[in-house]
Amino acid sequence: MALALSDVKRIAHLARIEISDDEAAQTLAQLNNFFSLVEQMQAVDTSGIEPLAHPLSAVRDMVQRLREDVVTESDRRADYQRPAPATEDGLYLVPKVIE
């Protein structure tokens, strides 16, 4: 897959990004290089290769040490909401800005 300069300009227009011709040309080259790399990776035969559960498992047999999932901070909602001008049921009340 390869993009044309018109594709880059159209994408920039749709994203509401102002782009010069030089920037569009540079972006086109970068995107086409990226798509070329993706095509090369997709061309590699990976049948019979087991997917990795984690990138480190390819390098060495390593167990990832994870900490226990415990609460480390107390609930301080009331402390944080005390200086607020208006709260209700744990939520901050703000003025309506959209009709």
From Swiss-Prot:
This is Aspartyl/glutamyl-tRNA(Asn/Gln) amidotransferase subunit C. It is an enzyme of class 6 (ligase). Its EC number is 6.3.5.-. Allows the formation of correctly charged Asn-tRNA(Asn) or Gln-tRNA(Gln) through the transamidation of misacylated Asp-tRNA(Asn) or Glu-tRNA(Gln) in organisms which lack either or both of asparaginyl-tRNA or glutaminyl-tRNA synthetases. The reaction takes place in the presence of glutamine and ATP through an activated phospho-Asp-tRNA(Asn) or phospho-Glu-tRNA(Gln). One of its GO terms (molecular function) is asparaginyl-tRNA synthase (glutamine-hydrolyzing) activity. Belongs to the GatC family. One of its GO terms (biological process) is regulation of translational fidelity. Keywords: ATP-binding, Ligase, Nucleotide-binding, Protein biosynthesis. Heterotrimer of A, B and C subunits. Gene3D superfamilies: Glu-tRNAGln amidotransferase C subunit, N-terminal domain. Coiled coil: none annotated. It comes from the Bacteria. InterPro entries: Asp/Glu-ADT_sf_sub_c (IPR036113), GatC (IPR003837). It catalyses: L-glutamyl-tRNA(Gln) + L-glutamine + ATP + H2O = L-glutaminyl-tRNA(Gln) + L-glutamate + ADP + phosphate + H(+); L-aspartyl-tRNA(Asn) + L-glutamine + ATP + H2O = L-asparaginyl-tRNA(Asn) + L-glutamate + ADP + phosphate + 2 H(+). SUPFAM superfamilies: Glu-tRNAGln amidotransferase C subunit. Pfam families: GatC.
